[in-house]
Regions:
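Active-site-adjacent structural elements that line small-molecule/cofactor binding pockets in enzymes
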Residues: 1-276
Length: 276
């Protein structure tokens, strides 16, 4: 099992972000992850919310080992060609530590406030599936022409190539059984989702497996990821870890606890070594 840390950057300063990233690195965690939202989701909506990919670019120079990604970037937020350039830039600034995690986007209020179009769910899912294909091709190919319903490229080339070859891992986040999970099965290197229990998680994994097989992919090659709350009593945290690990989760995002840093440090020092 690999563990990442949700930085939860809303309402916080750059210095606090650096401190949290250093904590993750010193604890031996695999990665640090930022929200990709332009307004604060929690607390004062007018409070600070550092932009995710710029934040990761800065953290790339403040860290040496942890991997860097968003959880997740909505495909309505940026044209996929722009996102590809941002991911590759962070990959170079970090020496090959970028993760590319995308979703369909969900926060209608944020879109409305900022004047970002928020299409119906069917179109957002179409954009997600087109976007993941465009990203992979721009990471690996020259002279890319793509004719989708919503995304079009004409003889596009982006350089430099990523440090990671063939490309940074592409994550698809979400739990929608009709569209999101099949998209993950067809295209993702990693799927991130959440469930209330092992039975629900097993059902979602089965959908991903089926879509992967139909696309000629080996389902075992798709890493399964989820998130772990550490605000509950430790026996409940251990129980959640056990049933998620039992259903093929291989990466867990540690949610920054509302109780603060001391709770996280207790988990890292006393609980994490006992898991698995």
């Amino acid at each position: 099992m690999r563990f990442g840390l949700d930085l939860s950057q809303h309402q916080l300063t750059w210095d606090e972000m650096v401190s949290r990233a250093h904590l993750a690195e010193e604890a031996g965690l695999d990665g640090v992850w930022a929200f990709d939202h332009f307004t604060a989701l929690y607390g004062d909506p007018g409070g600070p919310s550092l932009e995710a990919w710029t934040l990761l670019a800065g953290l790339a120079r403040e860290t040496s080992r942890v991997r860097l990604g968003t959880m997740v970037t909505g495909m309505t937020h940026r044209h996929p060609a722009v996102l590809a350039a941002e991911v590759v830039t962070v990959d170079h600034l970090s020496g090959g530590r970028a993760e590319c995690a995308i979703g369909a986007a969900w926060n209608e209020e944020e879109h409305r406030e900022l004047g970002i179009p928020f299409p119906p769910v069917a179109e957002r899912m179409d954009r997600l599936e087109e976007g993941v294909q465009v990203l992979r091709r721009l990471f690996t190919e020259d002279d890319v022409t793509f004719e989708g319903r919503h995304v079009r490229l004409e003889h596009a080339t982006y350089r430099p190539r990523p440090v990671q070859q063939p490309h940074p891992p592409i994550w698809v986040g979400g739990t929608g059984r009709r569209r999101t999970l099949p998209i993950a099965g067809r295209h993702a290197d990693v799927w991130h989702g959440w469930a209330d229990d092992a039975m629900e998680l097993a059902a979602m994994n089965a959908i991903i497996d089926g879509a992967a097989e139909e696309a000629g992919r080996d389902p075992a090659q798709i890493l399964r990821a989820s998130s772990l709350s550490i605000s509950e009593p430790w026996d409940e945290v251990r129980s959640a870890f056990d049933w998620m690990a039992g259903e093929r989760i291989g990466y867990l995002m540690i949610e920054w606890p509302s109780e603060g840093r001391a709770r996280l440090e207790e988990f890292l020092e006393q609980v994490l070594p006992t898991l698995g």
